[in-house]
A protein has these predicted regions:
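Interdomain regulatory linker/hinge segments that flank or connect interaction modules
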Residues: 6-17
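Long, compositionally biased eukaryotic signaling regions
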Residues: 4-6, 196
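Short, hydrophobic beta-strand segments that form beta-sheet elements in well-ordered domains
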Residues: 60-64, 79, 106
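Glycine-rich phosphate-binding loops that contact phosphosugars or nucleotide phosphates
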Residues: 74-77
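Flexible, glycine/charged-enriched surface loops at secondary-structure junctions
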Residues: 21-26, 189-198
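OB-fold/S1-family RNA-binding modules
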Residues: 1
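Long, charge-patterned amphipathic alpha-helical coiled-coil/hairpin "stalk" segments used as oligomerization
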Residues: 81-190
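Translation machinery proteins
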Residues: 17-70, 92-93
Length: 199
């Protein structure tokens, strides 16, 4: 398996060849899998918490009302959506798509899950973005903190994986540690572990 120092070297080489840009360029990890038949239904939809937060945290929407909704607002959720908001989205497919594409992750109060399924399930499901249920009295702050430092890795109908691991302003060792965290997680989910990753 690739080591952290090898990844650091690759990042340094990539940075050398880059032109100066006015925006923060992201750094992505590309992984090619082998000896897996995706046509036979193999799929992955993993949420992986990274050891080092990127300069732009993941966008997280919380679907909740009452105390959980208030706590989510205080904990700086990117948006808090209540019952009325979900009902409105159910009436407008275009607005629903726009809303779903805006966020990386969705968290939902368990009692709102049936309404979420009814109003947005058809759009969230195929994108692998169904909300993570948050039980009553669970610490929404720690859920938000975890998801804001996470990424989603999906494998469906393809043997290649692309995911963001950082940006050019981050220390190379931090970016490499993020890449290693993703690789280590994937190895545990693949049928033959490390052997399913093309060298």
């Amino acid at each position: 398996m690739v080591s952290e120092s090898e990844i650091v070297t690759l990042i340094q080489e990539a940075k050398k060849g880059e032109k100066e840009r006015k925006f923060k360029e992201s750094l992505e990890l590309y992984i090619t899998l082998k000896d897996i038949d995706v046509k036979k239904g193999f799929a992955l939809n993993e949420v992986i918490q990274l050891p080092n937060q990127m300069s732009k945290p993941a966008a997280v929407c919380v679907m909740a009302t009452g105390d959980m909704g208030l706590k989510a607002k205080d904990a700086k959720a990117d948006e808090v959506m209540d019952n009325d908001g979900l009902d409105k989205l159910a009436q407008d497919k275009r607005a629903s798509r726009k809303f779903i594409n805006k966020y990386d992750f969705f968290l939902a109060d368990t009692k709102l899950m049936p309404l979420v399924g009814k109003s947005l399930g058809q759009l969230l499901g195929p994108r692998g973005k169904m909300p993570t249920p948050v039980p009553f009295n669970a610490p929404i702050e720690s859920f938000l903190s975890r998801f804001k430092t996470s990424i989603r890795v999906r494998v469906k109908n393809s043997l290649s994986i692309t995911c963001k691991v950082g940006d050019v302003t981050m220390d190379e060792h931090q970016v490499a540690a993020n890449a290693i965290a993703i690789i280590n997680n994937l190895v545990t989910k693949l049928p033959n572990g490390n052997k399913n990753i093309r060298k």
